[in-house]
């Protein structure tokens, strides 16, 4: 195998990263997404992420991924109406959520809630495309309800009504979290961040969902597997760690001095670099503008200025660029989102991409079963039980 990979329909050469297993190895075909073909680009079904983030609401992108096309104005209105009607939780799902302790990891709550929903509203035999899309829409509409019903009950003993009349998924999330409708600015910020997180080709959680789908398993099982993969700190959770880093410091100068020492000591700084992008993460420029606007509106540029300074430091010292997580941490923090909910928000966005990949994998209708390079001992003589030492 060559030590470089030339992506199809592109002259851009990507060198596989030694720290990432199977880096640069194509593991299947997809018509859903391209990542880093030119080193710093991202497309969903052929549409540039910069155009989608600038012009689309999240529900438009969800429709693009799950239902295969950007909706017309009438189709978007009908889709939003459908999603609003799907925000409620069955009684037994609420009962399951009420049994989970407050100390539960929110990602475990998401996984358990989806499993309970799958037991209550299981996928029908036959696994039709229309049925899978309906389940995807139900999950998209109700994941915020699952998370925040548990959160308020476990922390305050309050049984909230998870149905709201908010126009968007992001608005619904913020309304349930804070108990009031969010500002237009916050709702717009959520639209953008969810669009940016919605899809990213064969990342670990998406590939997990495709492996499960390839076995002929149900939609819920594939989504649950993806949530489990995203729970791992090497995949999801980078924005949570990014905020922890930023909150260590009181000033940009203090942050710069400490990070330069850590870089000299070969410490890894989470929030920088990417397994696929080689030039820059195209999502970064978008979320950075969002973070700055939210910080200005909130009357505090402290976290933004620290994050901005460290962006400069990491480029000067390591030639490492920030990824989406670095300034999404600032954005979510400015909207009052608890740090432990950053990765669940990732789930709410990415369920659209996961669902699209599951549907696509089913159409391929092949089980995924790669081979392994055996590195163990060969031709060992068998030793009888009584003679082993």
UniProtKB/Swiss-Prot annotation:
The pathway this protein participates in, as annotated, is: Organic acid metabolism; propanoate degradation; Carbohydrate metabolism; tricarboxylic acid cycle; isocitrate from oxaloacetate: step 1/2
Q: What class of enzyme is it?
A: transferase
Which positions are annotated as binding substrate? 82, 200, 283, 350, 369
The temperature profile of activity is: Optimum temperature is between 45 and 50 degrees Celsius.
Describe the pH dependence.
Optimum pH is 9.
Q: Which InterPro entries match?
A: 2-MeCitrate/Citrate_synth_II (IPR011278), Citrate_synth-like_lrg_a-sub (IPR016142), Citrate_synth-like_sm_a-sub (IPR016143), Citrate_synthase (IPR002020), Citrate_synthase_AS (IPR019810), Citrate_synthase_bac-typ (IPR024176), Citrate_synthase_sf (IPR036969)
Show the SUPFAM superfamilies listed in the entry: Citrate synthase
Query: What keywords appear on the UniProt entry?
Result: Transferase, Tricarboxylic acid cycle
Write out the coiled-coil annotation as residue ranges: none
Q: Which domain of life is it from?
A: Bacteria
As its record notes, the protein acts as a catalyst of:
propanoyl-CoA + oxaloacetate + H2O = (2S,3S)-2-methylcitrate + CoA + H(+); oxaloacetate + acetyl-CoA + H2O = citrate + CoA + H(+)
Binding residues annotated for CoA, in chain numbering: 268-272
Q: Where is the active site?
A: 235, 274, 325
Pfam families, per this entry?
Citrate_synt
Question: Which family does the record assign?
Answer: Belongs to the citrate synthase family.
Subunit description = Homodimer.
Protein name, as recorded: 2-methylcitrate synthase
Q: Which organism is it from?
A: Escherichia coli (strain K12)
């Amino acid at each position: 195998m060559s030590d470089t990979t030339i992506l199809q329909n592109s002259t851009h050469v990507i060198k596989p990263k030694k720290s990432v297993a199977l880096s640069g190895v194509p593991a299947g075909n997809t018509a859903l997404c391209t990542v880093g073909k030119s080193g710093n680009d991202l497309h969903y079904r052929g549409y540039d992420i910069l155009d989608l983030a600038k012009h689309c609401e999240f529900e438009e992108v969800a429709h693009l991924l799950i239902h295969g096309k950007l909706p017309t104005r009438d189709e978007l209105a009908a889709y939003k109406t459908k999603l609003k009607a799907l925000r409620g939780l069955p009684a037994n799902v609420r009962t399951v959520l009420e049994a989970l302790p407050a100390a539960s990891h929110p990602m475990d709550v998401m996984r358990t809630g989806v499993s309970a929903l799958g037991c209550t509203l299981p996928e029908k035999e036959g696994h039709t495309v229309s049925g899978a899309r309906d389940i995807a829409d139900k999950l998209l509409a109700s994941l915020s309800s699952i998370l925040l019903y548990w959160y308020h009950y476990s922390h305050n003993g309050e049984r909230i009504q998870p149905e709201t009349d908010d126009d968007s998924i992001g608005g619904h999330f913020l309304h349930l979290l804070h108990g009031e409708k969010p500002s237009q600015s916050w709702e717009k910020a959520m639209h953008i961040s969810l669009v940016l997180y919605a899809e990213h080709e064969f990342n670990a959680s998406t590939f997990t969902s495709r492996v499960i789908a390839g076995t002929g398993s149900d939609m819920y099982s594939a989504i649950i597997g993806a949530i489990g993969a995203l729970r791992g700190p090497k995949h999801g959770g980078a924005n949570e760690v990014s905020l922890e880093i930023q909150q260590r410091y009181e000033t940009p100068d203090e942050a710069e001095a400490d990070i330069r020492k850590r870089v000299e000591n070969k410490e890894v700084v989470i929030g920088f670099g990417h397994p696929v992008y080689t030039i820059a993460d195209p999502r970064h420029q978008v979320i950075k503008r969002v973070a700055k606007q939210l910080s200005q509106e909130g009357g505090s540029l402290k976290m933004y200025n620290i994050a901005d300074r460290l962006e400069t430091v990491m480029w000067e010292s390591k030639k490492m660029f920030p990824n989406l997580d670095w300034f999404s941490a600032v954005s979510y923090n400015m909207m009052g989102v608890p740090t432990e909910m950053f990765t669940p928000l990732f789930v709410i966005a990415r369920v659209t991409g996961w669902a699209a990949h599951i549907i696509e994998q089913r159409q391929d209708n092949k089980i995924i079963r790669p081979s392994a390079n055996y590195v163990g001992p060969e031709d060992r003589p068998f030793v009888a039980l009584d003679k082993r030492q």
